[in-house]
Swiss-Prot record:
Subcellular location per the Swiss-Prot or TrEMBL entry: Nucleus; Cytoplasm
Protein name: Inositol-trisphosphate 3-kinase C
Tissue-wise expression: Highly expressed in tongue epithelium, taste papilla, heart, brain and testis. Weakly expressed in lung, liver and kidney.
Source organism: Rattus norvegicus
Ranges of Gly residues composition bias in the record: 44-58
Gene name linked to the record: Itpkc
Length: 678
């Protein structure tokens, strides 16, 4: 039985708990790129000759977009049926489950867009007042709406930012006349045709509330001037109003705010694995500590982002997740305290997000680490000295006589163990097993881990899958959590029926924002997990873009998981640019791979009939130019009731089970395309 990564100690490593090779830096030389055992694996999941060919044309969904009613859209299917039976999610003991395996990269050239656009038009709901929006800037010109109504006319040749209304509302078409630049010496084409969720049914005009700097505590921003306003996110350009009384986007702590109490949920990756280099020094667990005031961890600065957005979005009376928790059940134990500070050295790394529900341990602040300033967004040095935690590697992978240690970046210990022949064992989760088995026969197979079934080890069950990183040399890795929510509807129902206090969740919440808990929650010192997750999602780009960055490990060993309040478009764009170090070739490969994935998702029977919640996209590239993306984390992917299908783009309202996966993917592709063009 291997020791879990979060309960070891430095003294054990020094006393010889590790093999000599692990303690001395695994000095074995690498002999080129690693391959899976035997000949090149056939099949689409192995990256071999039968995989997807590289190359291909860009998507044409932006231009010439025809307008259809919702029923006519081939990728949407019939309307959701909220009353049908739902698949049972994995239990709490398996919430940390995720997937990792090999896929195949395919490449398409990026698509260039000319920017145009001049005026603003809004199509509100019949009973709602006219909502207006004003925007300035060349890189936001040409917003576009993703239309579902046959009575609206498309405006040809307009790159667009798509706003997603509620279910009965009209779609908004946004034009601008002035230039808007946020970074000097560069156009910003990547916001063309980005999408936002918007509930237009209760839109109200509101006086402007200028805000000179983006922050999670405001809901009004100055946006240059055509005299119109629309509900908007505080730090970005996307907002989604919820019918359960919650809103994503701005905080609820300013005078000009949206009337949400619970907001959307959030979630960290658990069990994320990372391989430090094999140069020298002990293996380091890269759980990112909160930096103290003397050495703050800097988030990218949203340079000169000026917007002016005000609105009141009224919410329905659906019962929110309870905030006052009264129960006799004892709270679950929190994460282990963080250890001494260290920095990862070396190249080869592994990174795999785990639990779709449990948050990563880097949320907790323990020991003498202190907390970083959540409002510090100077961005002048986005990859400053990072503080990590020294722990020994949970296991060492041996593949083709190449040894590389796996270190858990965040999350619960014991999720992963080393398999044989470059395979990884992940703690068993029935939902994930069922999903992976179905995906092996679905068109999505090249984009998901290759699955080898369940195995038993030391009396414990594991799902066996391929190591996603076996073909990379010193990779850079990024985990993006996809979708507009990361919790199942069943979890909300359970939280209402049997609210369970979580002291560790309360500590995580106050570490980020001491004023976030209610007085009752402060008195009890605990919050429910869905309550924490809903609050957490209001801070991140999950609420504004339909995806959020969970963590990044770069080839030089630098790790960063401090993206809890990375919400604004500019912040997310800067992080993506730093991840690839401005390499246009890598960006184009990522764009081609994601466009191919989007095409496959829209034609996948599995995807149309499953609610995909808490799933991630794993981005991996190395110095050789190899770049791939995979879908991972299927521990909370559940089948829909019979005859129900999802669009994966509509806003979520309790009962419709929409997850917003394609909405987030559309926006992610747009951002990467813009970076490649610039």
């Amino acid at each position: 039985m291997r020791r879990c990564p979060c309960r070891g100690s430095l003294s054990e490593a020094e006393a010889g708990a590790l093999p000599a090779e692990a303690r001395m830096g695994l000095e074995a030389l690498r002999g080129g790129r690693r391959r899976q055992p035997g000949l090149q694996r056939p099949g689409p999941g192995a990256g071999g000759p039968t995989g997807r060919p590289e190359g291909g044309g860009p998507r044409a969904w932006i231009e010439g977009f025809s307008l259809h009613s919702e029923a006519e859209r081939t990728d949407f299917g019939p309307a959701p049926c909220p009353d049908g039976p739902q698949a049972e999610p994995c239990g709490d003991e398996h919430e940390e489950c995720e997937a990792a395996g090999l896929g195949v990269a395919s490449e398409k050239p990026s698509q260039n867009k000319e920017l145009d656009g001049s005026n603003l038009q809004t199509h509100p709901k019949l009973s709602s007042p006219l909502a207006e929006m004003e925007m300035a800037g060349s890189w936001t010109d040409g917003f576009r709406t993703d239309l579902h109504r046959p009575d609206l006319q498309a405006r040809p040749k307009r790159a667009s930012l798509c706003t997603q209304p509620g279910f009965d509302e009209s779609w908004t078409e946004l034009d601008r006349s002035e230039l808007w630049q946020t970074l000097p010496e560069r156009d910003k084409p990547w916001v063309d045709h980005l999408r936002t969720h918007q509930d237009m049914s209760r839109l109200q005009n509101h006086p402007a509330c200028p805000s000179p700097e983006p922050s999670a505590g405001t809901s009004c921003k100055e946006l240059s001037a055509d005299g119109s306003r629309t509900p908007h996110d505080t730090d970005g350009f996307w907002i989604e109003s919820q019918t359960d009384g919650s809103l994503i986007g701005p905080s609820t702590q300013t005078a000009c705010r949206q009337p949400a109490n619970d907001g959307f949920s959030a979630q960290d990756t658990d069990g994320t694995l990372i391989q430090p280099g094999t140069d020298d020094g002990p293996w380091v667990d890269s759980v990112l500590e909160k930096s103290n005031g003397d050495d703050p961890l800097m988030e990218p600065e949203p340079r000169d982002l000026v917007t002016n957005l005000c609105s009141h979005l009224e919410c329905s009376s659906l019962c929110p997740v309870p905030r006052l928790i009264i129960t006799s059940e004892s709270p679950e134990p929190g994460a282990q305290p963080l250890g001494p500070q260290a920095r990862i050295e070396g190249g080869t790394g592994g990174f795999s997000s785990a639990s779709s529900f449990d948050e990563s341990e880097d949320d907790l602040v323990a020991g003498g680490g202190g907390t970083s300033d959540p409002e510090d967004r100077s961005g002048s040095k986005p990859w400053k000295k990072l503080k990590t935690v020294l722990k020994y590697s949970p296991f060492v992978v041996s593949f083709h006589k190449h040894y590389y240690p796996w270190v858990q970046l965040s999350g619960h210990a014991g999720n992963f163990q080393a398999g044989e022949d470059g395979r990884i064992l992940k703690r068993f989760c029935q939902c994930e097993q069922r999903s992976l088995e179905l995906l092996m026969g679905d068109p999505l197979r090249p984009f998901v881990p290759t699955y080898y079934g369940m195995v038993q080890r030391d009396g414990q069950a594991f799902n066996q899958m391929e190591d996603l990183l076996a073909d990379f040399e010193g990779p850079s890795i990024m985990d993006c959590k996809m979708g507009s929510r990361t919790y199942l509807e069943e979890e909300l129902v359970k939280a209402r029926e049997r609210p369970k206090p979580r002291k560790d969740m309360y500590e995580k919440m106050v570490a980020v924002d001491p004023g976030a808990p209610t007085p009752e929650e402060h008195a009890q010192g605990a919050v429910t997990k869905p309550r924490y997750m809903q609050w957490r999602e209001t801070l991140s780009s999950t609420s504004t873009l339909g995806f959020r960055i969970e963590g990044i490990k770069k080839a030089d060993g630098t790790c960063n998981t401090n993206f809890k309040k990375t919400q604004a478009l500019e912040q997310v764009t800067k992080v993506l640019e730093d991840f690839v170090n401005g390499d246009v070739g890598i960006l184009r490969k990522y764009v081609a791979r994601l466009e191919d994935l989007r095409d496959t998702l829209e034609n996948s029977p599995f995807f149309k009939t499953h609610e995909v919640v808490g799933s991630s996209l794993l981005f991996v590239h190395d110095h050789t130019g190899l770049a791939k993306v995979w879908m991972i984390d299927f521990g909370k992917t559940v089948a829909l009731p019979d005859h129900q299908m999802l669009s994966h783009r509509l806003p979520w309202a309790e009962g419709n089970r929409e997850d917003g996966y394609l909405w987030g993917l559309d926006n992610l592709i747009c951002l990467l395309q813009g970076l490649a063009q610039s």
